[in-house]
Design a protein with these regions (language model features):
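N-terminal presequence-like segments and the immediate start of the first folded domain
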Residues: 1-58, 62-75, 81-114
Length: 114
């Protein structure tokens, strides 16, 4: 069996320990990353939606960096949206700043109700 190694970004380990999950798991050459949200360092939600998207990507970046990875290493993204029609522009603005040149990752966006 392949060894699994838990990965945690600096400063947020208590959040994961409290809820009993890992920010990411490295297994062989693969990194499996838990879902990321636009929360502040203390875990509270950011009220401004575009800033919330930025924080989610910042949190993802921190997790990737803790594993020695970058956004260029991502091959597949699944995102969940509570109001896609009104959120799409803000999401695309931030996404396009991060992924500004090919090859782009696969991306599946799913509209959900909460």
């Amino acid at each position: 069996m392949v060894e699994r190694t838990a990965v945690f970004p600096a400063g947020r380990h208590s959040l994961y320990a409290e809820h009993r999950y890992s920010a990411a798991i490295r297994s062989g050459d693969l990194l499996f990353v838990s879902g990321q949200v636009g929360s502040r360092e203390d875990g509270t939600p950011e009220p401004d939606f575009q800033q919330q998207v930025r924080l989610a990507f910042d949190n993802l970046h921190a997790t990737l960096a803790a594993a020695g990875c970058t956004f260029d290493d991502i091959i597949d993204v699944t995102s969940f949206h509570t109001d896609p029609e009104n959120q799409f522009e803000d999401i695309m603005t931030v996404k396009n700043e991060i992924y500004s040149a090919p090859p782009y990752p696969n991306w599946t966006a799913v509209g959900v109700t909460w």
